[in-house]
Amino acid sequence: MELSSKKKLHALSLAEKIQVLELLDESKMSQSEVARRFQVSQPQISRICKNKEKLLADWCSGTANRERKRKRESKYSGIDEALLCWYHIARAKAWDVTGPMLLHKAKELADIMGQDFVPSIGWLVRWKRRNNVGFGARHVLAPSFPPEPPPPGLTSQAQLPLSLKDFSPEDVFGCAELPLLYRAVPGSFGACDQVQVLLCANSRGTEKRRVLLGGLQAAPRCFFGIRSEALPASYHPDLGIPWLEWLAQFDRDMGQQGRQVALLLAARVVEELAGLPGLYHVKLLPLAASSTTPPLPSSVVRAFKAHYRHRLLGKLAAIQSERDGTSLAEAGAGITVLDALHVASAAWAKVPPQLIFSSFIQEGLAPGKTPPSSHKTSEMPPVPGGLSLEEFSRFVDLEGEEPRSGVCKEEIGTEDEKGDREGAFEPLPTKADALRALGTLRRWFECNSTSPELFEKFYDCEEEVERLCCL
């Protein structure tokens, strides 16, 4: 005896359901006859009749996907509806709405609604399908009346003159992007060793944003097994700065603190971001295109580079002392992007707040006219041993020089080269490795007449490592 095959469910699209309703209204056909015509069950036709008003509303809205057969309600229907409302407003204003922009807005709406929701690409695809949303050419309706002229003296965001009087020094931020030859040593560097760094701080110097590094490698092997949220700085797999994502995070952070802040940017960057919606807590203030004043004082940028190079030379000297016969260039070739990320974070922390504040005042980028203390804070760390002040100063400003040909290839090497830390996977340390390392480090301190203050810092580190090992 053969088992009868299970009858396959035939779902109707929205367009077909409207045809069903039209047939029932305009003809004398019964629900059973209509069901046979569309090859569905009679109860399915009955459900269509019960949902008649909702189906007609979806059809008339013009936003529903008319070929969609099943409309499963989203778990976050409130976010769905709010995002769709924002989308229609954005399109009416002729904004170029992109996928990342919708993801950012969905997350922002979820935070406002108090929902623990992280939108994904898959969720966005389903949301677009549910609401018949596409990113084709814009069709903006012309207003039925001429726009009302702005009040006297009021200009658009792109035309705003640089005015800081409405902000306190704590709420005025400046940021700068700069190239950095992250593993260069005096007299030896290559262009392929470059990363792009984004620095941002407020004019008082009391708040520094997380350093962002952009590099050419999409997934450096030195990041294998690393949790990005545990790092003191961020890495972006491109030399270009991801302004949209960075500004969105900055805006969220300021919103959580209930602050309205000003961000000084180069006119070129502000022009590229023209029409960017969704910044509610960060006001972009462009510097004049003809201005030679950078949005983050050059003395602050130079101080960061000086501390970076000073710390890098210290690290390389330690490597040389461990490996006899290793040249400075050979030691530098082993520096990875991950090393550079940590050194950059430490160097940025070393830039003193007094220097930042005085530099903003001198450049006219901070509100108020009262100068800081007459005591001038040095922007340079102590000159490393083996270099004169002039040599170290030239090393700090290395990015302005032309790289020597051939050096880049030697420093990068190949994946098979021995000692190439960038091209090889290192085994992940275990909890036992971490505890043994603590014991080794303490023993080394004990044998080298370490100061009590350093032991206090070590105890804090030891306590935290032991806590993490117990998780």
From Swiss-Prot:
SUPFAM superfamilies: Homeodomain-like. Residues 31-51, 100-130 bind DNA. It is found in: Nucleus. Residues 3-55 form the HTH psq-type domain. PROSITE patterns: HTH_CENPB, HTH_PSQ. Residues 167-360 form the DDE-1 domain. GO terms for molecular function: DNA binding. PANTHER family: TIGGER TRANSPOSABLE ELEMENT-DERIVED PROTEIN 3 (PTHR19303:SF36), TRANSPOSON (PTHR19303). Belongs to the tigger transposable element derived protein family. This is Tigger transposable element-derived protein 3. The lineage of its organism: Eukaryota, Metazoa, Chordata, Craniata, Vertebrata.
